[in-house]
Amino acid sequence: MILAIDIGNTNICIGGLEGDRIRFAFRMVTRPHCTPDEYTAELRFLLRRFQFEKAACTGAILCSVVPALSGPLAEAVRRLTGFEPLRVAHTLDTGLTFAIDAPERLGQDRIADAAGAAALYSLPCMTVDLGTASTYNVISADRRFLGGFIVPGVQTSLRAISAGTAQLPPIAPEAPARLIGKNTEECLNSGAVYGTAAMLEGQIGRAHV
């Protein structure tokens, strides 16, 4: 079993992978100042819930968009698995080439998205990862990473509009009951959700590979 760790800006996702099967998966809130000892204790407690056994682990892989947490999480993984986690990077043998400026600065999450899409789906394709920042990646038929787009995530946009205005309240996005909102909260929610969907459709229509 491979222990996979995905460090995002909002959540840290952990999964146990056996071949194509996900044995378990859970999330932790991303906290910027945790020590290796704290992460080791928290991970050990959560992994026990899924009957994780060190002897059954054959490796680990780490993907991070929060560089300050990569070291503490990697140390926790070493302690819990006995393995040095493989770090996602553009230099890994994913079968992709990177037709972009400064591939060493490309986010590890975008590399993982592109590699997974190229392995699982026909090309060319576009990946969309809706997170704190939403990323769009374009992969050509000959397995070249061509670049993409980065935009604020749905929740990030809603937080920004609330923080930057006097009367618009903070809300959590949910499936809208209708397109045209009848009150402020509905208008914010519909704008965020349908606006994101329209942007996604528009970018797909404009990206020709």
Q: Each predicted region: which residue ranges?
A:
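N-terminal/domain-start alpha-helical segments
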Residues: 67-79
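Phosphate-binding/catalytic loop of phosphoryl-transfer enzymes
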Residues: 75, 83-87, 92, 96-164, ...
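A mobile "lid/hinge" subdomain adjacent to the ATP/sugar-phosphate binding pocket shared
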Residues: 162-196
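Conserved small/polar residues in nucleotide/adenosyl-binding loops
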Residues: 207-209
